[in-house]
C-alpha cells in the first residue's frame, strides 16, 4: 500500500465520521424580564443583534454607568444593538432589593429602557448558565459589578471589559461599531 492510497483511505474514514453536535448556542437560554413572570428565550428575543451583556447593581460605585449603557442602547439600538442587564447581588451585597425595587430604581434614576432580566448569580457555585458560557468563552469571570461582555450578531463572545471601563470608552465603542458592520445572520 502506497502512502498516497493510505492517505486517501484515512481521508475517506474521516469524511464519514458523523459531525460532532455543535455546542449549544450562547443565547439559547430562558430568563425572565426583570420583575416579569414569564421567561423568554434570549436567542429568540435578542439573537442576531450585537449585545453588551452587563451584570449590574444599584448600590455600587459603578452604578452611574447605567446612564452610559442607556446612551449606547439609544445610540445603536436602531442598528441592531442591545444592552442586556442582569442584576446581581454577588459583590458585597450591592444589589439587595427585590426585582420590582431594582426596576423602579433603574427607570426613575437613570431612565433605563434597555432590557433588564431577572436577578442572577454571576460568580461562584450558583453562577447562572449564561454567565458560565460567557466565562467559558473568554476565560474571564466578572471581578465586580458592571463587567461587560460583547457578543457578535452570530452569538460569539468577541470581547469583555472590566467594571472600570466606562460605556463610552473609545475601545469599547469601536468594538461595538466594528461588530455592527457585520451582516446579520439569516434567521
Language-model-derived ranges and their functions:
Residues 20-24:
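Boundary at the C-terminal end of the N-terminal hydrophobic targeting segment
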Residues 129-187:
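Thiol-/selenol-based redox modules, centered on thioredoxin-like
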